[in-house]
């Protein structure tokens, strides 16, 4: 009954396009879903779930315990596998099952990235790979769901990318931030709601170096200097010093906000069920070796350092189970 009702709403759909205030003649849609229809997202997800099941693609678990993993958010898909052959097999099955329901993989927007591996592996791979007749560019970095993923897991490049995006938002609002008609507190609210979130998108998972923290601070002070302007002493204008900006702003710095967000997310992960993908990745210990010399900090190491700065690094996973206590810990980071 429900299927027939849905089909009835989709059959014989007439559309028109508004051009320069005038409507075009109507035309009938015989394929695809209607843009803006409340059912479109649901129907697409059902169709894609059916494709995944028939193709034998399993999104559960993690790559630590399987030869391949399929990650999907709407129509943004990621095939993760241990070998090129497994990637090719999974892609071929996905492509052929998707074609049966009228879905086509956009090969032009699909990229292939080798994570880890040696320089010899990268050289032998070349600049393109071909799978089932489709040619994909081999890349060193790729933007997935707004975040920059790199072959060497370089988070600093993602942070630089976020700062560049934040700079675009800043320049777009620069005229208002310089305006004498807008109160500085209102400008600060504009910064916190329209600019800072652009910079801190995905910050909960950042493992940051000291130079990354400094880059964030430099960006924030640039915005604050625009908001509060210079100061005149003895008829001479000078740029405000860092401590003067902090006193005028009166809010937690962007570095503290990033640290608090990371701790807040760590608490969420610690409280997740054991079969949750994020919890599985966090609790797992991948098989392999680490390079000689000084080791890169892991995300868990960063969280423990953040908690150590407020004296909460011991038994923090147990503390995370208490939401009220954990909220107090997060607030203490912002103070």
Task: Tell what function each PLM region has.
Residues 3, 15-335:
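Short linear motifs embedded in intrinsically disordered, charge-biased segments
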